[in-house]
Amino acid sequence: VGRYGLIHLSNCTDFYFENPDGVDLAGYAFDYYSCFPTFKPNIYLHSNSTLAANWADDLNKGADEGQNHTTADFNLIYTDALAFEKNKAFEDLWVMNAADATIEENASIIKSAMDAYSALSDKAKEQLKKDKCNSTDTYAGKLMALAKAIGLAGDIGTIQYTISSDGKTLTVTGSGALSADMANVAWIEAKVGSVENLVIESAITIQNGALNNMTALETVDAVRGVKVVGGKNVFPN
């Protein structure tokens, strides 16, 4: 969507971009000179979409001068996150308890949902951490609780970790330091030798011994800012 592609649409409450691969919003794609709406417009788009820094501009010009409108006055709703929420194969999970999770048929559904969740972008995951699947739980929170019940997820302090259903991908996120306790957690200890891919989704610190016995490790996908204690090599040789 190019410059001034969507201009002065002050009465439009919902915008749907249905390209399954995402959309590119250029600078000034949305322009509201003197006519920013009194509500927050909903913008539905795939999380792979690319938004220019000034994709919505002229928000505080003319009659709107001094109103302090920003792009936060739009609701960005990611369609791939919504597709996960509406997936019929996963609908029973949102009313399931920990005891139900251990039933073989249910555990299989949880594993499939975990794999689907892991494949989502960070933006889509963030939406699932906010959207409610019932009156108290978010979709991400409920799924993680069920995954813990069958040994596919856990916590060490402020670090959360999950392992894929095939046991080959270990994902860690959170804040603070990943300690040697990681290698000593029972379910990790039993599976760590099969981990081929390590995904580090947040800028944590990895302490010596945290990745002990990860002898099959082939790839590490880490965000910028991950640190290691003392600058030492914490990865297995």
What do these predicted ranges mean?
Residues 1, 9-24, 38-51, 167-175, ...:
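Structural signature of tandem-repeat unit edges
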Residues 34-89, 148-156:
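Extracellular/surface-exposed low-complexity segments
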Residues 5-9, 29-30, 210, 234-235:
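Periodic small-residue-enriched repeat registers in elongated scaffold domains
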Residues 22-26, 48-58, 124-127:
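Short, charged/polar "capping" segments at the starts of alpha-helices
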Residues 32, 54, 111-116, 156, ...:
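A composition-driven surface/loop motif
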Residues 102, 109, 151-191:
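N-terminal segments that cap or nucleate solenoid repeat domains
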Residues 12, 119-129, 179, 217-219:
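Short loop/beta submotifs within extracellular cysteine-rich repeat domains
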Residues 80-151:
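Beta-rich interaction/scaffold domains
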